[in-house]
Amino acid sequence: MTATFKKEVNLVFECETGNYHTFCPISCVAWLYQKIEDSFFLVIGTKTCGYFLQNALGVMIFAEPRYAMAELEEGDISAQLNDYKELKRLCLQIKQDRNPSVIVWIGTCTTEIIKMDLEGMAPRLESEIDIPIVVARANGLDYAFTQGEDTVLAAMVNRCPKKDQLTKPLQAVSFIDTDSLQKEKGPKYDSINHDKDLVLFGSLPSTVVTQLNLELQRQDIKVSGWLPSQRYSDLPILDSGVYVCGVNPFLSRTAATLMRRRKCKLIGAPFPIGPDGTRAWVEKICSVFGKQPQGLEQREAEIWKGLEDYLQLVRGKSVFFMGDNLLEVSLARFLIRCGMIVYEIGIPYMDKRFQAAELAFLEKTCHDMNVPMPRIVEKPDNYNQIQRIKELQPDLAITGMAHANPLEARGISTKWSVEFTFAQIHGFTNSRDILELVTRPLRRNNSLEGSLGWTQLVKSTV
Amino acid sequence: MKLAYWMYAGPAHIGTLRVASSFKNVHAIMHAPLGDDYFNVMRSMLERERDFTPVTASIVDRHVLARGSQEKVVETITRKDKEEQPDLILLTPTCTSSILQEDLQNFVNRAATESKSDVILADVNHYRVNELQAADRTLEQIVRFYIEKAKTQNDLATIKTEKPSVNIIGIFTLGFHNHHDCRELKRLLTDLGISINEVIPEGGSIKNLKNLPKAWFNLIPYREVGLMTAKYLEKELNMPFVATTPMGVIDTAICIREIEAILNFTNQSKIDKEPYNFEDYIDQQTRFVSQAAWFSRSIDCQNLTGKKAIVFGDSTHAASMTKILAREMGIRISCAGTYCKHDADWFREQVSGFCDSVLITDDHTKVGDMIARVEPAAIFGTQMERHVGKRLDIPCGVISAPVHIQNFPLGYRPFLGYEGTNQIADLVYNSFTLGMEDHLLEIFGGHDTKQVITKSLSTDSNLTWTIEGLAELNKIPGFVRAKIKRNTEKFARENNISEITIETMYAAKEAVGA
């Protein structure tokens, strides 16, 4: 064990640049189309992309979602057909059938490789068909899984209104009563924060949005808007002087765009995952807004008290993150605080600047809990990781879906990493849900092994 | 460009990988960007595979793209050669990487010199063929490669087995009830005194491909995958094949008779032996072992008379099902269709005379529209038609891929052979309302659909919900809303809160474990 799990004093970063698996970044359409209720997502790619959305994510067109594939065929690839005309034809059809407030074009690896000029075509087509078109390059050449959301949000930053603009996002107002909108928006921007606006970015289900808003409201801080908003026509005002803070660790491009294009002030905080993270996140925002946190410590303590039954199950247990959704550092930090030992944090991409506060918090947590620092392995090699898992025999491996069954068959308890992407894990209120997920395989396998007495379900050893 | 929401058959590389990962000790390398490697997820999840899927993605990222991918691909191949020591490494691009127009054959040649295992490039056009065509092509390519290799090495096993024997070609991973069908076919063939020489690709070893010619003939249960291989073996080694799918009592009998003819032809030289005759076996199985023939005659099924159904699926299953329903069950088929557009002529010919119309399309919306128009009493289709049926309140039996986790039952559910006829009869029976039920429904005016009045445990009503609280409650998905409401009210009562706000709701949630 010591060979691969040395006691480190500082965080160790490695980059294996291996062959690893994550879901394609175009998966973000699966949650973003639900989040932005008046949107339509058009993924411009091949049959491979379409089959992925249909299969791996299990999202069929069952609910007639507001997304579709623009499937590139041989004629498109060999440039025998005119991209602009083809996209116009499809977008007109979408406009007629669904009439969305915005069409988001999701570029893929294929549009990158054939160098389709989506950014060039969008403004032309937008003015021609009179629907805003946002272009995001959620391709697997540059990004992994959840970073797809990052590309979409970064693209949307440019569509957020500025304070001096009376109109809402470009052209989206045509059928909305502007007066009532102004009335609605009006009071939001004065009141309690005194001219300091706070916009949070990251896509979360509306109930979690409410919870985090309430959490800040308790500290007398009013959230003036979220990116993305529930409706495209309600995108928040972004201007210089607006404070922005992220809720997800994979949004580094969005953060950079907010700072560069809108001169917003980024609040760099740990992410509001787990009671410890949520408290640190709220505290950081409070400090920027010059507020003394009220009852926060007590609130955190109460949440921890409520988690005690789960904590008893995880204390002293070890966990191995193979790396998938870029939530790994925050989750690892929370689990270490819960008393777990983290052997390895695999992560597809590590932006040390955007995650700086989270990394420092991880380091502090390790010191506080007196456990060794985990290795952070960027772009891990899944084959090597399996060898390490074999050697370390962690109590739990958090893995992609392709590795879960084979590991279970070899007696390693696993949890799908994607579940943390889709479950509600942010804020004080949902801390329990994280532990519910983490402990499920432990509870289940405990009860099975107790009565059945076998763990290995493959003929030869690993 | 095509606006697409859903597809029946996947992209070509999926077919190639299905074939490669079905063989034992074959490793496939996907030359693809991150995210294109979801095949591993599909196989691991759907087949509940215990072993790691023998497919590795050689990731193409911006870096690799800039430098050229040769180094990366060759390195991945040679590395897997050492780590897994496979007999064969198969390289495939995806739709995406195939447009890079790299000389992948050259990569393969280079890697082959450094590897112990054989290395080949799957030769498939990713924009012209679908999953099934690619699987057919890849299987043929692998078989051809090893037959030719054996020929040059002079160890091709050309001497036929003493007793009749068969190769079953086209059973593979992620197929529709393929494992069950294979077991049933083995049983059927054993009953006929025919031994199984090789089953490929599922569970087969490429080292044994040189033994394929030992069999007397090849059996191709599904025409989507295996036909190309059978034709190659016929042309190259003069091996006869049977491609009649033994599905339903009539086609199973036809299949057995074709086998009989081949055995007798092969056996000609051995004058002293009696000719093979399976008629007694067919008769016995049809009338007494399989329950299907009796079932459709039984009084229970009289109500099937004149019922309308629609059939849609891959060409093998849709054609067979159409014939079974029309000939063996006396059901009227308003429309039979397939998404295997490349096989349209064969399909039309097979179902002609058994249905009112034929629909050849890979556009699921056309199938849905057709179903809505015809309003059949039952549908026999894919998961998509099942979904359409749910929306229209028409029962649907699933008879064909694309596969779904439900198509991997743990119990024995073949569609082929005589046990398959029973399964299909059950499926048909469960898809229609039959017998007395039909009349009772008429008498009582449909099923009792009255809602069960929701039980509420909160008896005292001194609790009020604020408007915001109620709005928040309504955001919670319906199936857990009542539980959350109950828990919140319980919490409120315990804490002497009379007005429930959003804060109360979340405080209640946080307090659950306390």
From Swiss-Prot, chain A:
**CC annotations in GO:** chloroplast
SUPFAM superfamilies the UniProt entry points to: Helical backbone' metal receptor (SSF53807)
Q: Which InterPro entries is this protein grouped with?
A: LIPOR_BchN/ChlN, Nase/OxRdtase_comp1, Protochl_reductN
So which domain of life are we looking at? Eukaryota
The protein's enzyme class: oxidoreductase
Q: Name the coenzymes or cofactors required.
A: [4Fe-4S] cluster
* Protein name, per record: Light-independent protochlorophyllide reductase subunit N
Taxonomy, top ranks, is:
Eukaryota, Viridiplantae, Chlorophyta, core chlorophytes, Chlorophyceae
From Swiss-Prot, chain B:
Give one Pfam family, short name only. Oxidored_nitro
What does the record give as the function of this protein? Answer: Component of the dark-operative protochlorophyllide reductase (DPOR) that uses Mg-ATP and reduced ferredoxin to reduce ring D of protochlorophyllide (Pchlide) to form chlorophyllide a (Chlide). This reaction is light-independent. The NB-protein (ChlN-ChlB) is the catalytic component of the complex.
Organism, as annotated: Pleurastrum terricola (Filamentous green alga)
Q: Which UniProt keywords apply?
A: 4Fe-4S, ATP-binding, Chlorophyll biosynthesis, Chloroplast, Iron, Iron-sulfur, Metal-binding, Nucleotide-binding, Oxidoreductase, Photosynthesis, Plastid
Spell out the SUPFAM superfamilies in the cross-references: Helical backbone' metal receptor
Q: What is its main location?
A: plastid
Please name the pathway: Porphyrin-containing compound metabolism; chlorophyll biosynthesis (light-independent)
- Catalytic reactions on record: chlorophyllide a + oxidized 2[4Fe-4S]-[ferredoxin] + 2 ADP + 2 phosphate = protochlorophyllide a + reduced 2[4Fe-4S]-[ferredoxin] + 2 ATP + 2 H2O
Its protein name is: Light-independent protochlorophyllide reductase subunit B
Q: Where does this protein hold [4Fe-4S] cluster?
A: D36
